[in-house]
């Protein structure tokens, strides 16, 4: 943000107010188009974010974004946060994401590659943290298999004449094969030692999720707790 190259960046208040203004303008354009061509659905062919590519979906996405932004400024600008939250949750403005099927995500259908998936599968750099292992396994969370893969075999830490790691014999003291295993934060042990630990299930073909109805329900609950609205 700023007026020209090299200018001082806008402060946070200016930036957030600009976000709300952008949402106002975007929704007005969509609503105007709906009125002029109610039976057209020209978004569908090029839409890589919503499930059906319909105008109502984009209105819901816009309102949900507005609610997210409102909650982010609620501790520093209560008046503006309350105003924007009420606007987002006003049913006359088109509603927000409510159903589990209403997911805003970048689809891989048009060649998009999930960058986290590349880092995870290509570099093996997205591992389960030991704290996450403790929570998920301690509470027997059924979502564990959705988040992480089970550990694979680990190998001895060997280096060839050129200083590169090479696979050696399977470590005999590693007994977590086929289990969920996280990495302890702050460890100074080399990467190869932890190479077999649980990695994320995200792949290069996994859609990149930007917003879900689950988040919006939490935002609505926060708005209600703050006394902004009856958030349902």
Q: Which residues make up each language-model segment?
A:
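Structured, solvent-exposed acidic/aromatic patches
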Residues: 1-232
């Amino acid at each position: 943000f700023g007026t020209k190259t090299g200018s001082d960046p806008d402060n946070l208040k200016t930036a957030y107010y600009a976000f709300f203004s952008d949402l106002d303008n975007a929704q007005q354009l969509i609503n105007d188009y709906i009125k002029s061509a109610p039976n057209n659905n020209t978004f569908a062919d090029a839409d890589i974010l919503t499930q059906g590519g319909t105008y109502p979906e984009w209105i819901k996405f816009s309102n949900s974004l507005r609610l997210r932004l409102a909650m982010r400024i609620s501790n520093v600008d209560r008046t503006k946060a309350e105003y924007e939250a009420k606007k987002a949750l006003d049913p006359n403005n088109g509603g927000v994401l409510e159903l589990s099927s209403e997911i805003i995500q970048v689809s891989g259908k048009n060649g998009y590659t999930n960058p986290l998936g590349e880092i995870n599968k290509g570099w093996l750099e997205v591992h389960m943290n030991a704290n996450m292992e403790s929570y998920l396994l301690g509470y027997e969370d059924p979502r564990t298999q959705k988040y992480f893969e089970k550990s694979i075999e680990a190998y001895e830490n060997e280096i060839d004449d050129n200083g590169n790691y090479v696979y050696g014999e399977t470590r005999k003291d590693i007994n977590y094969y086929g289990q969920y295993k996280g990495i302890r934060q702050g460890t100074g042990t080399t990467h190869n030692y932890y190479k077999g630990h649980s990695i994320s299930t995200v792949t290069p073909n996994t859609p990149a999720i930007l917003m879900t109805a689950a988040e919006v329900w939490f935002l609505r609950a926060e708005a209600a707790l703050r006394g902004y609205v009856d958030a349902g």
